[in-house]
């Protein structure tokens, strides 16, 4: 198991380009199941979760080729299996995204429940309830979701709670349903719009993605296309915060600022000097003092839960007290205990973190607990005095492409070491 060794105290400077968005790429890979023709996906990030999704499709009989342009040519026609086995699903909850496409295209699917997933408390039930409303029959048996359908039929569906993957799953399934499907109480994340754009490029008829209602007019089949994955807004936000906590000056290229409007707003409140084009965001904290900012996470277009941990670090070294309220996920403060080992002064009260700024953080041996928590520990190591070791970094490799290489390019000093 590898770890990262970080020597703190280096200001980050320079320009960096975002990788393709993991949260856009995963449903797009699943969407290739809907087509009888090849789909070419460009700008896919090189991440463990992408590899896992390819392994999942490959286990069903899909053919995936890296072509001469370094794009992935995917053929999911005539799959010989429609089962997503636990060995793969347990490592990535997004595996559930193949459920809707498999039932819509092949009339059947057997998907292992994601590891540690309690149906009552996680939004997987939103997927299942909505798929049943489209006409599927679903049985939960021996840790698997077994779904069948002779035909899916469009209907009006209101999700019981906002769910990104649930919205994506049903949006994909409805593309091959008979008639029109109306989805309300839907997620509005940019990645929903990205998926709709891909589906429409495959000759689907999806309208209203990113608004309060998504309308899908079913078609008989979808075609092949070539599509480029947009930049990862969470990766962009993470590097902007890295610049802020190291008192640096970094330009993130290839990202639409509108996708990070709330993050940018909070960075400006913190004292950062921000400049933007329609395709880049630059942040300078060289001549500013960090100010604490209060944050409440919520579904898009509000402040993203995936940036909460990074802002915890920024607030931890700001002068004053701040509050972070996590309203999207339970147990999203697991990084706080590790940050406190580095000198942070953070107290957790339920879904609230009260952060009292300190003068300095100090290097320590810390352990990542999840993807965004691992990012926060790396940021803390960058601005800490001395040396920090972050273990269990397989979490970071699930969502950040070559993070230590990119940060080193900006002036950090990070080594990847075997345990």
Model-inferred region functions:
Residues 1-419:
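Short, structured segments at the rim of ligand-binding sites
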């Amino acid at each position: 198991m590898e770890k990262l060794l970080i020597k703190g105290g280096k200001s980050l400077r320079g320009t960096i380009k975002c990788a393709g968005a993991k949260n856009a790429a995963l449903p797009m890979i699943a969407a290739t199941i809907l087509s009888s023709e090849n789909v070419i996906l460009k700008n896919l990030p090189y991440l463990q979760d992408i590899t896992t999704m390819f392994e999942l499709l490959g286990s069903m009989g899909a053919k995936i080729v890296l072509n001469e342009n370094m794009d992935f040519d995917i053929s999911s026609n005539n799959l010989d299996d429609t089962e997503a086995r636990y060995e793969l699903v347990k490592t990535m909850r997004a595996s559930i995204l193949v459920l809707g496409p498999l039932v819509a295209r092949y009339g059947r699917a057997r998907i292992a429940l994601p590891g540690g997933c309690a149906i009552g408390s996680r939004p997987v039930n939103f997927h299942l309830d909505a798929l049943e409303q489209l006409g599927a029959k679903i049985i939960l048996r021996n840790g698997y979701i077994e779904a069948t359908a002779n035909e899916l039929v469009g209907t009006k569906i209101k999700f019981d709670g906002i769910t990104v993957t649930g919205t994506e799953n049903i949006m994909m399934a409805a593309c091959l349903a008979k008639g029109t499907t109306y989805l309300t109480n839907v997620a509005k994340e940019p990645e929903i719009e990205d998926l709709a754009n891909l589906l429409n490029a495959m000759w689907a008829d999806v309208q209203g993605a990113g608004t309060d209602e998504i309308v899908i007019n079913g078609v008989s089949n979808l075609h092949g296309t070539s599509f480029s994955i947009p930049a990862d807004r969470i990766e962009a936000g993470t590097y902007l915060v890295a610049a802020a906590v190291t008192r640096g000056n970094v330009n993130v290229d290839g990202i639409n600022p509108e996708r990070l409007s709330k993050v940018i707003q909070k960075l400006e409140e913190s004292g950062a000097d921000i400049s933007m084009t329609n395709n880049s965001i630059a942040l300078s904290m060289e001549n500013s003092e960090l100010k604490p900012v209060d944050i409440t996470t919520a579904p898009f277009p509000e402040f993203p839960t995936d940036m909460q941990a990074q802002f915890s670090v920024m607030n931890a070294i700001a002068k004053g007290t701040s509050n972070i309220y996590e309203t999207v996920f339970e147990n999203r403060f697991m990084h706080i205990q590790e940050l406190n080992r580095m000198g942070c002064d953070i107290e957790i009260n339920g879904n609230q973190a009260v952060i009292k700024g300190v003068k300095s953080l100090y290097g320590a041996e810390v352990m990542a607990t999840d993807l965004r928590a691992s990012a926060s520990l790396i940021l803390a190591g960058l601005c800490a005095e001395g040396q920090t070791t972050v273990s269990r970094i397989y979490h970071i490799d699930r969502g950040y492409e070559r993070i230590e290489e990119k940060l080193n390019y900006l002036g950090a000093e990070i080594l990847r070491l075997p345990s």
